[in-house]
């Protein structure tokens, strides 16, 4: 078991107005808290592992693209969503938001 205290969390601004706090990182899983400023943006990207997100505060628009379709969803406080591995996705933040994200690091 590994305990990570708040003072030891790795904190980085991953995009303008988007702060990531690594809450825990194991061999096969990563969990982080994201803090988004109003009107910030996470550009389109993809990764080889699933992502699970729960919104603690605020509202965001999520655009998820597969090879043959594009889905746009709005997520609000209390909502969760899953991005399958290798799906392109981006986030458009309409108001200050906080999420908890987890990734399974083994495809």
Q: Which functions belong to the PLM regions below?
A:
Residues 1-28:
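A short, N-terminal "cap"/entry segment at the start of jelly-roll beta-barrel domains
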Residues 30-47:
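Conserved short histidine dyad/triad with adjacent acidic residue
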Residues 49-65:
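Glycine- and acidic-residue-biased ligand/ion/polar-headgroup-sensing regions
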Residues 67-85:
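Short acidic-glycine-tyrosine-enriched beta hairpin
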Residues 85-107:
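Ligand-binding loop in jelly-roll beta-barrel domains
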């Amino acid at each position: 078991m590994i305990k990570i205290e708040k003072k030891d969390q790795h904190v980085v601004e991953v995009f303008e107005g988007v702060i990531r706090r690594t809450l825990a990182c194991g061999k096969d899983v990563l969990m982080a808290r994201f803090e988004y400023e109003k009107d910030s943006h996470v550009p389109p990207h993809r990764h080889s592992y699933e992502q699970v997100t729960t919104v603690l505060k605020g509202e965001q628009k999520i655009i998820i693209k597969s090879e043959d379709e594009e889905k746009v969803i709005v997520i609000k406080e209390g909502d969760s969503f899953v991005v399958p591995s290798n799906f392109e996705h981006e986030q458009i933040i309409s108001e200050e938001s906080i999420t908890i994200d987890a990734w399974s690091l083994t495809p």
